[in-house]
């Protein structure tokens, strides 16, 4: 995609807010179903003030439901120059990098206007908390190690829904699987430089998009439908699906990391910056940055992502990685934080299982037992929360 008039953003964002706080966004005009696009944001380059706008860099829509491309690789699957993803000059981080990176940038694809997946009267199992037996697993690891999974399905969502693995879970008495991160991710630069990837997946870059590397069938419909089929299969077996979600940080890492999406769209809005030096990021996560959930726009994005996974993908709950980060204000943990208030107020999200990992590496970071309750109940709710 190339740069267009900024007023075109309303065509892309007619169902959700623009991701840009300060500055303006450029987006393609009149996008149809299946169109591939990226965003460019105009604004000041002033890292010392927290601004990192660089219109030479094509940016991923944070509301993308499918990510086209892979960080570190070109469209043909060949390794790309990682410095092309940097917003700053690789030799002097105080200056912007003026090289256009559209050829290798991560892009979004416009989803179909109407869902076509047949859920076949899918119903949420709604297992009461007191009877929940939760089994944490990794999509790739669990399906590669089980001897009953055909080789073609190993490492995939389809493999996780295979009868051999479903029967194994039932035999163990599992009522709820907790999937380690399945959001589309960006493997950290330092790992790629060593020929490695982030196996565990705690480096999300698109909160509404499933990770395509776990799909047997490529393409938007293939990835989405394969994940939905997995959920439908587990529900038929009476097993809930909970997602391990990473909203405490993004895969853009620290100030020397890539500019893939949020950093280039509105760095000062999306991230918690060091008060005395806004060119640097507060790092309560140990992963280089922290999302700023005191900002209404950031809470909107996270809530939209959660609602998408419940309404469209039929998941039954979430486990929040490093949950205290989601409730920090001025550096302190706040049980009345805006994000928790948004969860309690949301008719859909207050019905599902919500699990908090109770620590981060910030001050007073261990908060076990100090997370507020939500209005989750099994006595008055219907069997399906998808409407």
Task: List each language-model region with its residue ranges.
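Single conserved hydrophobic/aromatic residue that forms the stacking wall/gate
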Residues: 1-16, 378, 383-387
């Amino acid at each position: 995609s190339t740069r267009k008039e900024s007023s075109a953003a309303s065509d892309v964002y007619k169902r959700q807010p623009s991701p840009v706080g300060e500055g303006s966004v450029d987006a393609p005009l009149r996008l149809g179903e299946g169109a591939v696009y990226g965003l460019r944001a105009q604004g000041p380059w002033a890292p010392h003030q927290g601004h990192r706008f660089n219109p030479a860099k094509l940016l991923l829509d944070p509301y993308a439901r499918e990510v086209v491309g892979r960080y570190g690789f070109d469209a043909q699957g060949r390794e790309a120059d990682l410095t092309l993803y940097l917003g700053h000059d690789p030799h002097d981080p105080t200056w912007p990098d003026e090289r256009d990176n559209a050829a290798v940038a991560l892009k979004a694809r416009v989803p179909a206007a109407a869902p076509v997946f047949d859920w076949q009267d899918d119903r949420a199992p709604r297992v009461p908390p007191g009877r929940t037996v939760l089994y944490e697993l990794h999509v790739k690891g669990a399906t590669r190690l089980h001897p009953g999974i055909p080789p073609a399905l190993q490492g995939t969502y389809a493999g996780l829904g295979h009868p051999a693995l479903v029967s194994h879970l039932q035999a163990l008495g599992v009522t709820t699987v907790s999937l380690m991160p399945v959001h589309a991710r960006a493997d950290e630069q330092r790992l790629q430089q060593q020929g490695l990837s982030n196996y565990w997946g705690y480096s999300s870059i698109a909160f509404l998009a499933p990770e395509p590397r776990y799909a047997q069938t490529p393409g938007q419909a293939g990835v989405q439908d394969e994940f939905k089929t997995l959920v439908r299969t587990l529900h038929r077996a009476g097993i809930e699906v909970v997602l391990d979600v990473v909203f405490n940080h993004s895969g853009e890492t620290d100030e020397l990391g890539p500019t893939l999406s949020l950093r280039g769209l509105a760095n000062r809005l999306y991230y918690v910056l060091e008060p005395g030096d806004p060119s640097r990021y507060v790092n309560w996560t140990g992963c280089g940055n922290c999302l700023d959930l005191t900002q209404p726009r950031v809470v909107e994005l996270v809530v939209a992502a959660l609602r998408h996974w419940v309404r469209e993908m039929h998941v039954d709950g979430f486990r929040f990685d490093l949950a205290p980060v989601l409730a920090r204000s001025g550096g302190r943990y706040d049980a009345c934080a805006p994000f928790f208030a948004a969860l309690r107020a949301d008719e859909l999200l207050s019905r599902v299982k919500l699990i908090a990992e109770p620590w981060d590496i910030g001050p007073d970071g261990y908060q076990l037992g100090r997370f507020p309750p939500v209005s989750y109940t099994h006595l008055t709710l219907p069997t399906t929360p998808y409407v």
